[in-house]
Regions:
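Dynamic "connector" segments at or just before major functional cores
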Residues: 1-132, 143-144, 153-164, 169, ...
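Short, solvent-exposed amphipathic alpha-helical segments in soluble enzyme
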Residues: 131-134, 209-211
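Short loop/turn microsegments at loop-to-beta-strand junctions
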Residues: 148-150
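An internal, acidic/charged active-site-proximal segment
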Residues: 172-229
Length: 229
C-alpha cells in the first residue's frame, strides 16, 4: 500500500441475518403503529439498526450514529432519530412484550409455568441521579456511576419473557415479587416455578412464594444453615 487509493472500504453484513428474524417476528408492522408524527420508515430503520448493533457490536448510541456508513444497505439516520428510539421503546414496552410472547408461544415449546430469574445492573457514564438512576451496589464494580437495576425472567428455552427496571439502589431481593406478578399477569397463571440464585434467597421472597403456592428452586449456602437443616 503506497497511497490512500490502494485502500478499499469494506462493509459489514452481519445484520442481514438478524433482519431475517426481524421480518419473521413482524416487528416492522408492530413499530409502525407507534410512529405518530414521525416517518414510519425512518423509525423502523432506526430501531432495526440499533437492535442489530446491540446484537453484533454493542456500542453507545452516539458511536452507532458515527459508524452507520460501515453497514451495507443501511440508510443513515440523524442522531435525534436514533435517540428518539428510546422513547418509542419505553412507550411500547408492555405491548411489545405481549406481542413477542404470542409469537414465541406459537413457535417454541415454552413452558409458561416455569421461569428463571436473575438480576443485573446497568451503569451510566454519569453521576447525575434521577428517578431510576441511583447509586448502588454495582455488579460491574462501577460504584462511582449511577445505575439502574434490571430483573429479567427467561423461559425454559433461555428466551427472555419480560423484565422490570428498578432504582439503582434497589437490593436484588426486593425485585422478585413485582417480576413474578408481572409474569402471572402476562400468562394468567395461578402457579409458577421460579428458579433463581442465592442472591434472591430471603425470608421475604420465600414467604411470598409459599403464600402464593408457587414452586421454587433457589440456591442456599449450607455453611450458613443450622444443623437441623
Amino acid at each position: 500500500i503506497t497511497s490512500a487509493e490502494d485502500v478499499t472500504s469494506s462493509f459489514r453484513f452481519g445484520h442481514a441475518l438478524i433482519q431475517h428474524l426481524w421480518r419473521e417476528l413482524k416487528l416492522e408492522k408492530f413499530f409502525e403503529r407507534y410512529a405518530g408524527k414521525r416517518d414510519p420508515e425512518e423509525l423502523v430503520q432506526s430501531i432495526f439498526y440499533l437492535l442489530a448493533r446491540r446484537c453484533t457490536d454493542p456500542s453507545s448510541i452516539y458511536s452507532c450514529y458515527q459508524e452507520q456508513s460501515q453497514y451495507a444497505g443501511h440508510t443513515e439516520q440523524t442522531l435525534d432519530a436514533l435517540y428518539g428510539v428510546l422513547d418509542i421503546l419505553a412507550e411500547s414496552k408492555e405491548d411489545l412484550i405481549e406481542f413477542l410472547s404470542v409469537f414465541f408461544q406459537k413457535k417454541t415449546k415454552r413452558k409458561n409455568g416455569c421461569a428463571y430469574y436473575d438480576v443485573t445492573t446497568h451503569s451510566f457514564e454519569s453521576t447525575k441521579w434521577g428517578e431510576l438512576r441511583m447509586f448502588g451496589f454495582s455488579k460491574s464494580h462501577k460504584n462511582n456511576e449511577v445505575q439502574v437495576v434490571m430483573g429479567l425472567l427467561i423461559d425454559n428455552n433461555g428466551i427472555p419473557v419480560t423484565y422490570e427496571l428498578f432504582p439503582g439502589n434497589t437490593m436484588d431481593q426486593s425485585t422478585l415479587t413485582k417480576s413474578v406478578e408481572r409474569l402471572r399477569e402476562l400468562y394468567r397463571l395461578e402457579k409458577i416455578t421460579v428458579v433463581a440464585d442465592r442472591g434472591l434467597n430471603s425470608g421475604t421472597n420465600l414467604g411470598y412464594l409459599c403464600s402464593q403456592d408457587h414452586n421454587f428452586v433457589i440456591s442456599y449456602t449450607l455453611k450458613r444453615s443450622t444443623q437441623e437443616f
